[in-house]
Amino acid sequence: MKLRLSALALGTTLLVGCASSGTDQQGRSDPLEGFNRTMYNFNFNVLDPYIVRPVAVAWRDYVPQPARNGLSNFTGNLEEPAVMVNYFLQGDPYQGMVHFTRFFLNTILGMGGFIDVAGMANPKLQRTEPHRFGSTLGHYGVGYGPYVQLPFYGSFTLRDDGGDMADGFYPVLSWLTWPMSVGKWTLEGIETRAQLLDSDGLLRQSSDPYIMVREAYFQRHDFIANGGELKPQENPNAQAIQDDLKDIDSE
């Protein structure tokens, strides 16, 4: 099963090749760049090659694709009520009801969310990148705040990563115990890293991998906050990239 999530993971990596390295767009700032580069070197030159990447390779090579899809569907289904609320907060009740329908159908008919029944039944109900509370803040023009590279976590901003904590107050996420939340986060992280294994070469070939990772973070969250659209004034190749993402989604 090919998800828009996978398209975005690839697309946001490709976006950086033509993105500006400036940090004054849409409230971006990187006042701790020296510290962040040190943390980046730890995360991506120590933690990733010796721990994260080997786990992701084993996950990709030894876990059957149907099992991976099922676990991804299940963890994604847990977020559907929060996504619904965020769309309502953004003034988009139609998309809010789409995600309510996804949650209802997949929970009742899809074995608690392991099977994406809604997406298979109707193309308009296919899974998309989740809109979290940080995306809602971005939708209303709230700036990111300082960009930080955290050890064991990676890119962090107060708006998107801190703001997303608000989603934990909505059911079903509010029902998860701390170990359950950590397990969900770990599964999602391993799956995302496994999807990006084929893009490792792009990072290695970059003249400044830190800038590439930082700009990929901003581009991805801009894309989500803007409703899945790229603004041409911020990226002259926005329309071409938008078309490529649509082609990937249609496969």
Curated annotation (Swiss-Prot):
UniProt-listed PROSITE patterns: PROKAR_LIPOPROTEIN
Phenotype on disruption: Mutation leads to accumulation of phospholipid in the outer leaflet of the outer membrane and increased outer membrane permeability. It confers sensitivity to SDS-EDTA.
Superkingdom to which the source organism belongs: Bacteria
InterPro entries linked: MlaA (IPR007428)
Listed GO biological process terms: intermembrane phospholipid transfer
Keywords, in A-Z order: Cell outer membrane, Lipoprotein, Membrane, Palmitate, Signal
Lipidation positions, renumbered (S-diacylglycerol cysteine): 18
Compartment annotation: Cell outer membrane
GO cellular component, one term: cell outer membrane
Predominant location category: membrane
Pfam families, alphabetized: MlaA
Region (Disordered): 228-251
Signal sequence interval, chain numbering: 1-17
Lipidation (N-palmitoyl cysteine): 18
Membrane topology: Lipid-anchor
Job of this protein: Involved in a phospholipid transport pathway that maintains lipid asymmetry in the outer membrane by retrograde trafficking of phospholipids from the outer membrane to the inner membrane.
The family this protein is said to belong to: Belongs to the MlaA family.
PANTHER family: INTERMEMBRANE PHOSPHOLIPID TRANSPORT SYSTEM LIPOPROTEIN MLAA, LIPOPROTEIN VACJ-RELATED
Protein name: Intermembrane phospholipid transport system lipoprotein MlaA
Taxonomy of the source species: Bacteria, Pseudomonadati, Pseudomonadota, Gammaproteobacteria, Enterobacterales
